[in-house]
Design a protein with these regions (language model features):
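Macrodomain-like recognition of ADP-ribose-binding/processing modules
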Residues: 1-140
Length: 141
């Protein structure tokens, strides 16, 4: 898939199979590899362990451990955790815990995603990429 607008061009990979296999192939891929940032939405009630978060916690427990260190009143914050760095090629795997969900889904809270917080978190991810990586480095999100 190729997306183009007037000023930018971006290739979005379509992944078939296990996301974590794709990640391993790219961060260990030598000169053909790249750094990968995995932004994902988290809630603000210190609950990390369902859905995608459960898969992350099983494979990279440090992501969950760091999330639990945040405390309360964190809606709109983004926490970056580097879980791997390829010392030979400099490729990193970084998770971005975007605290953009206010509570959990329930009958009283059917849509807990807070769009203002999500926007704020996405801006933080964008700033992080610009500050951490050189313009010529390959980064996938």
């Amino acid at each position: 898939m190729h997306i183009t607008d007037k000023t930018h061009s971006s290739k979005i990979p379509i992944i078939h199979g296990d996301l974590f296999t794709f990640i391993d192939d790219h961060i260990h891929g030598g000169n053909n590899g790249c750094s990968i940032i995995i932004p994902h939405v988290c809630n603000n009630i210190n609950s990390f362990g369902a859905g995608f978060a459960a898969a992350v916690a099983n494979r990279f427990p440090i992501v969950k451990e760091n999330y639990h260190l945040l405390g309360s009143k964190i809606l709109g914050r983004t926490q970056f955790i580097e879980v791997f760095k390829n010392k030979t090629f400099g490729h990193s795997l970084i998770f971005a815990n975007m605290i953009s969900q206010n509570g959990a889904i329930s009958s009283k809270n059917p849509r807990p995603l807070n769009y203002a917080s999500l926007c704020q978190s996405m801006i933080m991810v964008s700033k992080f990429i610009r500050e951490k990586f050189d313009k010529d480095q390959s980064v996938q999100i």
